[in-house]
C-alpha cells in the first residue's frame, strides 16, 4: 500500500528523493511484541514509520494494533484509537495509506466480524487520522446492517394420479419438515397442489393469520389427474406471488416444485412460463421424485423449471422416502440466499465485502478495496467528501468475475490528464488481471486491462504506479506476481507502461529475483524510492519475503528509461546479511521520504515482528583525467642508434581526480580515502617505460581527499631502446574510494557509485618522421615466389611456402600490411619470423645493412564476393622505415582433396595506415602449375597358373592358363586410369596363347585390343640369355582397359585366361621356358602424378613355368633285368655245388652232433633190427 502513497506524493510534487545505495550494516530496528508487527509499514509525514500489527490482541473481540516509530528516538509508541465495540476482530493495521497537503493517515481493518442470526459476515472499517494521529473519521461511517431476511416461499406439489396416497402423505410430511426448519418471523409460506386443475390450499395471508401454521396442511387432499406443471407455475406467479395473497414487495421469492414425472396433457410450454418467473425475480427449486428422472428428457425438464445454474437448484431422489435426505440441503441453500434481491449467480452482495483490504488516497477521497463483495468478485468504495460512497466494480461488463478478488490491491495513476484508479484481481479466472478505471460523468468505468498467464500466480497481488521522470504523469505500473512459479525462482514483477490512446495494455520487461529460490514470493511488496542514482529516473524496491527459507530479501532496481526498469537489480539485501534472526524480510515496504534528516531517502522494510529502517549513503563520483607534457615522445628519445641507451625522460604525467556528489547534497565537504594505482603499458610483456619514482612500471599512492579536483604529477623514463614505436605507451589508472564516516550523522559513510568506472587509460604517442608536412608518403612494393617448387602436387605437397618481399622506397610506413589472396583448398598455417634490411644505394645498387628480426601477426578471413580466402600479415608495432626491405615466409596447408584446377593463382597486395593510394607496385600475382597426387597400384594376384609340364608326345595338345592382376586405388581422390596388358600370342607363326580378358567388377570398363610385333628376331640367342617368352621376341596382344573413374579404395580384378599350345616350345631348344604377361597402369600425367617413391607399383608381371620331358618304354628294361637275374643265380648255384658246399657241411654237422652225445656218458641208443 505504501507504493501507491509514494506515487501519489510524486504526482503532487513531493520533494526529490536523493541517494543511491542502501546501507545494510548500520540499520535501525523497531521491534514490538504485537502479533504480526511489521505486516504493513508506511513512511508518514517525513517523520514517522507507521507499523501495523493486525493480529495483536488488544482486548476481547478486538484484534489489531497500530504503532508510530521514530528514527531519532529508536522507539515505537502505540496509536490509540476509539474502536467501536461492534468492530469485532477487526485486524487493524492490515492495510495503510497516507496523503499529503494536508497529511492524512488511513489505517484499515478488513475483518470486522458482523453477526446476523446464524451467519457471521466479514466487513471492514478504516480510521482517518490527522498528522498528530488524532482520530478524525471512520470509513464506512456506519456499520452495515444485517441483510434483509424476508422470504416468501411457495410449495407447488404434484397431486396427479401417478402418485400413490402413501407417497402423497410422505410428500406432505416433507413440506411440513421444511416449513419447520425455515420458520421464522420473516418467512411466510403458501401451498398450491396441481394435477390437470389447481387448488390453493393456503396463501401467505392464511399463513400469517393462523396461530398454528402447520395445521394448514391437515386439510390437504390429493387431486389426481394429469400433470399440468407449466400451467401450475403460471398460476403460482399470477395468484400467489401477489400482494392480494399476502406476498411482500421486498421479500425474496422462492418457489419449490415437487413432482414425480414429466408434465402430461399441458399445452403450455416452459418457454412461455419461465421468463415470467424470471421477470418476477422468483428463485425456483425443482425436486424430482422417482425413477422417471433417470431419463435424460425428464432431467432436462427439471433443469427447465429450476433457476440457473441448474446444478445448484435441482434435486433428484429415487422415491418419496428419500425426500427427508435432502431436507438439510434445501434448508442450507435457502438460508444462503437470504439477503439477495435477485436470483443471480451471486450468493452474497456486501455481506463479505472486507472493505479496507487495500487502500489508497485520491484527490476525491480515500478508496477502499472490497475484495469480498458480490461473492468475492470484488470492487472498491470511493468515499468523496460529504457525498455518498461510490462502488467501483466490473458489473457493467457482463464478465464472470466470481472469486476474482478485485480490489486486492489498489494504486492511483495520473493518466491522459485525469486521475485513474488501478485495481488488482489476482484470482480472476485463476490467473489474475489488473484493471484501469477512469471517471466519466461521475461514473467509474474500466478502460484497459492486462491479464496474467499462469494459474495460481496471483497476478496483481501488489501494484505500484511509477512516474519515471517526475513530470506528474504516471509512466508505468509495476504488477507483482508473487506466486509465479519457475523451477529455480518464485515470483516476478511485470513492468507495464501505461497504454496509449486506442491501444491495448501490455507488459514489457519482467523482473526476477535471484536464482535458487522457487518459493521466494518475489513481488509480494513494491515501493517507489525516487531517483536514487542521479539519472533523473525513478528507482524502485521489491520485496521477496520467501527467499532463503522465508528469511527474505529486498531488491533495488533502477529506472532504465521513461517506459522501462532495468532488468537486473543494482543491489540485493538479504536477511542473512542482518545480524538479527528475522523472517519474512521484505513482506512490506515503504520508501521515498527522508526520515533521518540527512537529505537522503530512506527505506522501511517490514518483517515478522520487526521493522528495519535502511538509510541510503551519499554517493561520490570520480572523473579522472591524465595529461602528458610533452604530449608525444620525441624521436631523439626513442630512436636509438645503438642497442643500449641510457635512461631518458619521456614525459611528465599529471593525474587528476575530480570528486563530486551525485546528486548534490547539503552534507558539506565529504571526505574519502582514495587509493590509486598507476601502471605503464599494462598487459605488455616487455617494458618500454618506467616511473622515475619507483624505477618500475607500477606506482601506488594513497590520499585522503575532499570534494573538487586533486592532481598528482609523475615523471616517466625510457629505460632502453624500444622495438615497438608505433603503439602509444599507455598509462592505466585504477582507483578505489572508501568514504570517511560522518560523525554528525551517526557515522553515515559516503561511497563510490557502483556504476562508476574505477579505471582510466591515457595514451602517450611516439613522434612520427613524416617530414615538414607531417604526412608520411610511403612507396611500397611487393613480390613473392615459391622457393624450390615448380609444380604443386596436391596430395603430395602438404605445405606451400611463399617467400614474400616488401620494399619501401618512400617515407616511413605505419601499420604496413601484406594481404595474400588464395583459393579455397589452401589454409594459412604460419608465418616465419621475418627479416628487415636497411638499404643503401651505392652505384645504382641497393646494399643490405642493419638486419634485424620482424614479428608479424596474421589473420585470415573469407572473401565471399570472389570465393577466395585472404590472409593479412601486419607489422603494426614496427615502423617500416623508408629505404627498408622486409622478407618473410608464409606457409599454407594444402588440403589433399583440394580442387585447384591446372594452375594456382596467388595474389598479394601491400598497404599501410598512411592511406597512400595504391600503385601497380603494391599488387603482385603469380601462377603455379598444379597436379594431383594419386596412389594407384597393380599387382599379380597369387591365384594364377604357376607351373605346367608336358612330354614331347603332347606337343599337339593345349592347356588352360590363367593370369590374375589386382588393381587398387589407395589415394585420396578418384582418378581415371587405363590398365594395359601385354601377352605373347604367337611365336614365328605358331600359336602360343589364345587369351581373353575379363573384368566383372566394373561394367563401365571398356577394353581395346591391338597386335604388336616383336622387337627382336634372334630367338635362340634370346633364349640362351633368358628363357622367357615375352613381347620382345613374340607377337603380342596389347589390351587397354579404360576405367572412367577409379574410386577411392576401389579394388578391381582382371583375369587373362586362354588355351596355351606347346608346339612352339621346340623352337626355343629349351626344356624349361617362362611365359610372361605384363600389366601397367597409366593416367594423364599432365594432371595426375603418382606419389613419389611409389612409381614401381604402376607395373606388374606374372610368369608361368613351362617344362618339357621325354616318355621311356619300360618292357625291354623289365625283360632284360629278369633274364640277367636268372642267369646270375644259376652261375652262383653251380659254383657252390662244385665246391661241395651242400654235402660236406651236412655230414660234419651230423658227426659233431653224435660226438657230443657219447662224451656225456649216456648210452647210445640201439638201432632196431
UniProtKB/Swiss-Prot annotation:
Q: Where in the cell is it found?
A: Membrane
What does the subunit comment say? Answer: Heterodimer of an alpha and a beta subunit. Alpha-X associates with beta-2.
Residues that bind Mg(2+): 158, 160, 162, 260
Identify the keywords attached in UniProt to this record, alphabetized: Calcium, Cell adhesion, Disulfide bond, Glycoprotein, Integrin, Magnesium, Membrane, Metal-binding, Receptor, Repeat, Signal, Transmembrane, Transmembrane helix
Identify the glycosylated residues.
89, 267, 393, 734, 949, 1059, 1084
Family named by the database record: Belongs to the integrin alpha chain family.
* Extracellular topological intervals: 20-1116
Q: Which GO terms are recorded in the biological process aspect for this UniProt protein?
A: cell-matrix adhesion; defense response to virus; heterotypic cell-cell adhesion; integrin-mediated signaling pathway; positive regulation of angiogenesis; positive regulation of cell migration; positive regulation of cell population proliferation; positive regulation of endothelial tube morphogenesis
UniProt FG-GAP repeat ranges: 23-78, 79-138, 341-392, 393-444, 445-505, 508-566, 571-631
User: Mind telling me which InterPro entries this protein's record contains?
Assistant: FG-GAP, Int_alpha_beta-p, Integrin_alpha, Integrin_alpha_C_CS, Integrin_alpha_Ig-like_1, Integrin_alpha_Ig-like_2, Integrin_alpha_N, Integrin_dom_sf
Q: Which gene encodes it?
A: Itgax
Q: Residues of the signal sequence?
A: 1-19
Which positions form S-S bridges? 69-76, 108-126, 116-146, 496-507, 640-721, 656-711, 770-776, 858-873, 1007-1031, 1036-1041
Question: Which Gene Ontology cellular-component terms appear in the entry?
Answer: external side of plasma membrane; integrin alphaX-beta2 complex
Which residues are recorded as binding Ca(2+) 2? 531, 533, 535, 539
Predominant location category? membrane
- Topology of this chain in the membrane: Single-pass type I membrane protein
Binding of Ca(2+) 3: at which residues? 594, 598, 602
Annotated motif GFFKR motif: location in the chain? 1140-1144
The entry's function note states:
Integrin alpha-X/beta-2 is a receptor for fibrinogen. It recognizes the sequence G-P-R in fibrinogen. It mediates cell-cell interaction during inflammatory responses. It is especially important in monocyte adhesion and chemotaxis.
GO molecular function (one)? receptor tyrosine kinase binding
Q: Where is the VWFA domain?
A: 152-330
The record, for PROSITE patterns, names: FG_GAP (PS51470), INTEGRIN_ALPHA (PS00242), VWFA (PS50234)
The lineage's top-level taxon is Eukaryota
Instruction: Give the source species.
Output: Mus musculus (Mouse)
Protein name according to UniProt: Integrin alpha-X
List the SMART domains: Int_alpha, VWA
Specify which residues bind Ca(2+) 1 according to the UniProt entry for this protein: 467, 469, 471, 475
Amino acid at each position: 500500500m505504501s507504493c501507491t502513497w509514494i506515487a501519489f506524493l510524486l504526482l503532487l510534487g513531493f520533494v526529490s528523493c536523493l541517494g543511491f545505495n542502501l546501507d545494510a550494516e548500520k540499520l535501525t530496528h523497531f521491534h514490538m511484541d504485537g502479533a504480526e508487527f511489521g505486516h504493513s509499514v508506511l513512511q508518514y509525514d517525513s517523520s514517522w514509520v507507521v507499523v501495523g500489527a493486525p493480529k495483536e490482541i488488544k482486548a476481547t473481540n478486538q484484534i489489531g494494533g497500530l504503532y508510530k516509530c521514530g528514527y531519532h528516538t529508536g522507539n515505537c509508541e502505540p496509536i490509540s484509537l476509539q474502536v467501536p465495540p461492534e468492530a469485532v476482530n477487526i485486524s487493524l493495521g492490515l492495510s495503510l495509506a497516507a496523503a499529503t497537503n494536508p497529511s492524512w493517515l488511513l489505517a484499515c481493518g478488513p475483518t470486522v466480524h458482523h453477526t446476523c442470526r446464524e451467519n457471521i459476515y466479514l466487513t471492514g472499517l478504516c480510521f482517518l487520522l490527522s498528522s498528530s494521529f488524532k482520530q478524525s473519521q471512520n470509513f464506512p461511517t456506519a456499520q452495515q446492517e444485517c441483510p434483509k431476511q424476508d422470504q416468501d416461499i411457495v410449495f407447488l406439489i404434484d397431486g396427479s394420479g401417478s402418485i400413490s396416497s402413501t407417497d402423497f402423505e410422505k410428500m406432505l410430511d416433507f413440506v411440513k419438515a421444511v416449513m419447520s426448519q425455515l420458520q421464522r418471523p420473516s418467512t411466510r409460506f403458501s401451498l398450491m397442489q396441481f394435477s390437470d386443475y389447481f387448488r390453493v390450499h393456503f396463501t401467505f395471508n392464511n399463513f400469517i393469520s393462523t396461530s398454528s401454521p402447520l395445521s394448514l396442511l391437515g386439510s390437504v387432499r390429493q387431486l389426481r389427474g394429469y400433470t399440468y406443471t407449466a400451467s401450475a407455475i403460471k398460476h403460482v406467479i399470477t395468484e400467489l406471488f401477489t400482494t392480494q395473497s399476502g406476498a411482500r414487495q421486498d421479500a425474496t421469492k422462492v418457489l419449490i416444485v415437487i413432482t414425480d414425472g414429466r408434465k402430461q396433457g399441458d399445452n403450455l410450454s416452459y418457454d412461455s412460463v419461465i421468463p415470467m418467473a424470471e421477470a418476477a425475480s422468483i428463485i425456483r427449486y425443482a425436486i424430482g421424485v422417482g425413477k422417471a428422472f433417470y431419463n435424460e428428457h425428464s432431467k432436462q425438464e427439471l433443469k427447465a423449471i429450476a433457476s440457473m445454474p441448474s446444478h445448484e437448484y435441482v434435486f433428484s431422489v429415487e422415491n418419496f422416502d428419500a425426500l427427508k435426505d435432502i431436507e438439510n440441503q434445501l434448508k442450507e441453500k435457502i438460508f444462503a440466499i437470504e439477503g439477495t434481491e435477485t436470483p443471480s449467480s451471486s450468493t452474497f452482495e456486501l455481506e463479505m465485502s472486507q472493505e479496507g483490504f487495500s487502500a489508497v488516497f485520491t484527490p476525491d477521497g480515500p478508496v477502499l478495496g472490497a475484495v469480498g463483495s458480490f461473492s468475492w468478485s470484488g470492487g472498491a468504495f470511493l468515499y468523496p467528501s460529504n457525498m455518498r460512497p461510490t462502488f467501483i466494480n466490473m458489473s457493467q461488463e457482463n464478465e464472470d468475475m466470481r472469486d476474482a478478488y478485485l480490489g486486492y490491491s489498489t494504486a492511483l495513476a495520473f493518466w491522459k490528464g485525469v486521475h485513474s484508479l488501478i485495481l488488482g484481481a489476482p484470482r480472476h479466472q485463476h490467473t489474475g488481471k489488473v484493471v484501469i478505471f477512469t471517471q466519466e460523468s461521475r461514473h467509474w468505468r474500466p478502460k484497459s486491462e492486462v491479464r496474467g498467464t499462469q494459474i495460481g500466480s496471483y497476478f496483481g497481488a501488489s501494484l505500484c504506479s511509477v512516474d519515471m521522470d517526475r513530470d506528474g504523469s504516471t509512466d508505468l505500473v509495476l504488477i507483482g506476481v508473487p506466486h509465479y512459479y519457475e523451477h529455480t525462482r518464485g515470483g516476478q514483477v511485470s513492468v507495464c507502461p501505461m497504454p496509449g490512446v486506442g491501444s491495448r495494455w501490455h507488459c514489457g520487461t519482467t523482473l526476477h529475483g535471484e536464482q535458487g529460490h522457487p518459493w521466494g514470493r518475489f513481488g509480494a511488496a513494491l515501493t517507489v524510492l525516487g531517483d536514487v542514482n542521479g539519472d533523473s529516473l525513478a528507482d524502485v524496491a521489491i520485496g521477496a519475503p520467501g527467499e532463503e527459507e522465508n528469511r527474505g530479501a529486498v531488491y533495488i532496481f533502477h529506472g532504465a528509461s521513461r517506459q522501462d526498469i532495468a532488468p537486473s537489480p543494482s543491489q540485493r539485501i538479504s536477511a542473512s546479511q542482518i545480524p538479527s534472526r528475522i523472517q519474512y524480510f521484505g513482506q512490506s515496504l515503504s520508501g521515498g521520504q527522508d526520515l533521518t534528516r540527512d537529505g537522503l531517502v530512506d527505506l522501511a522494510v517490514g518483517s515478522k515482528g520487526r521493522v528495519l529502517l535502511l538509510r541510503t549513503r551519499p554517493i561520490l563520483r570520480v572523473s579522472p583525467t591524465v595529461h602528458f607534457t610533452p604530449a608525444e615522445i620525441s624521436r631523439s628519445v626513442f630512436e636509438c642508434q645503438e642497442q643500449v641507451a641510457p635512461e631518458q625522460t619521456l614525459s611528465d604525467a599529471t593525474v587528476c581526480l575530480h570528486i563530486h556528489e551525485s546528486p548534490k547534497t547539503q552534507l558539506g565537504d565529504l571526505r574519502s580515502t582514495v587509493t590509486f594505482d598507476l601502471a605503464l603499458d599494462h598487459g605488455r610483456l616487455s617494458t618500454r617505460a618506467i616511473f622515475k619514482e619507483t624505477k618500475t612500471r607500477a606506482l601506488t599512492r594513497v590520499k585522503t581527499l575532499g570534494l573538487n579536483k586533486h592532481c598528482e604529477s609523475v615523471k616517466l623514463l625510457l629505460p632502453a631502446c624500444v622495438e615497438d614505436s608505433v603503439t602509444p605507451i599507455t598509462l592505466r589508472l585504477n582507483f578505489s574510494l572508501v568514504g570517511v564516516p560522518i560523525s554528525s550523522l551517526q557515522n553515515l559513510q559516503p561511497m563510490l557509485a557502483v556504476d562508476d568506472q574505477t579505471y582510466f587509460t591515457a595514451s602517450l604517442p611516439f613522434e612520427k618522421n613524416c617530414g615538414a608536412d607531417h604526412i608520411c608518403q610511403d612507396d611500397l612494393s611487393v613480390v613473392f615466389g615459391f622457393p624450390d617448387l615448380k609444380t604443386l602436387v596436391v596430395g603430395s605437397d602438404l605445405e606451400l611456402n611463399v617467400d614474400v618481399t616488401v620494399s619501401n622506397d618512400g617515407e616511413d610506413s605505419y601499420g604496413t600490411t601484406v594481404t595474400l589472396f588464395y583459393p579455397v583448398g589452401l589454409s594459412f598455417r604460419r608465418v616465419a619470423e621475418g627479416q628487415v634490411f636497411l638499404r643503401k644505394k651505392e652505384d645504382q645498387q641497393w646494399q643490405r645493412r642493419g638486419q634485424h628480426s620482424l614479428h608479424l601477426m596474421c589473420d585470415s578471413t573469407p572473401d565471399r564476393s570472389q570465393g577466395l580466402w585472404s590472409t593479412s600479415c601486419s607489422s603494426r608495432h614496427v615502423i617500416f622505415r623508408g629505404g627498408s626491405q622486409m622478407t618473410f615466409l608464409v606457409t599454407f596447408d594444402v588440403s589433399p582433396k583440394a580442387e585447384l584446377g591446372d594452375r594456382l593463382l596467388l595474389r598479394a597486395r601491400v598497404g599501410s595506415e598512411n592511406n597512400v593510394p595504391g600503385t601497380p607496385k603494391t599488387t603482385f600475382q603469380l601462377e603455379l602449375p598444379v597436379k594431383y597426387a594419386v596412389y594407384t597400384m597393380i599387382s599379380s594376384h597369387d591365384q594364377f597358373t604357376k607351373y605346367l609340364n608336358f612330354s614331347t608326345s603332347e606337343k599337339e595338345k593345349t592347356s588352360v592358363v590363367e593370369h590374375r592382376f589386382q588393381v587398387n586405388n589407395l589415394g585420396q581422390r578418384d582418378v581415371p586410369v587405363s590398365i594395359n596388358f601385354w601377352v605373347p600370342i604367337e611365336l614365328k607363326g605358331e600359336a602360343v596363347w589364345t587369351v581373353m580378358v575379363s573384368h566383372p567388377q566394373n561394367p563401365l570398363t571398356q577394353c581395346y585390343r591391338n597386335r604388336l610385333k616383336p622387337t627382336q628376331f634372334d630367338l635362340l640367342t634370346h633364349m640362351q640369355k633368358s628363357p622367357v617368352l615375352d613381347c620382345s621376341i613374340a607377337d603380342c596382344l596389347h589390351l587397354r582397359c579404360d576405367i572412367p573413374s577409379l574410386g577411392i579404395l576401389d579394388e578391381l580384378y582382371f583375369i587373362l585366361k586362354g588355351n596355351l599350345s606347346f608346339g612352339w616350345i621346340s623352337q626355343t631348344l629349351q626344356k624349361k621356358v617362362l611365359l610372361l604377361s605384363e600389366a601397367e597402369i597409366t593416367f594423364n600425367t599432365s594432371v595426375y602424378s603418382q606419389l613419389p617413391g611409389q612409381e614401381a607399383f604402376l607395373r606388374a608381371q606374372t610368369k608361368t613355368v613351362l617344362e618339357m620331358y621325354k616318355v621311356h618304354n619300360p618292357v625291354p628294361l623289365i625283360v632284360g633285368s629278369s633274364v640277367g637275374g636268372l642267369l646270375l643265380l644259376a652261375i652262383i648255384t653251380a659254383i657252390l655245388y662244385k665246391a661241395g658246399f651242400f654235402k660236406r657241411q651236412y655230414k660234419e654237422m651230423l658227426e659233431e652232433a653224435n660226438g657230443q652225445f657219447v662224451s656225456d656218458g649216456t648210452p647210445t641208443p640201439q638201432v632196431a633190427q
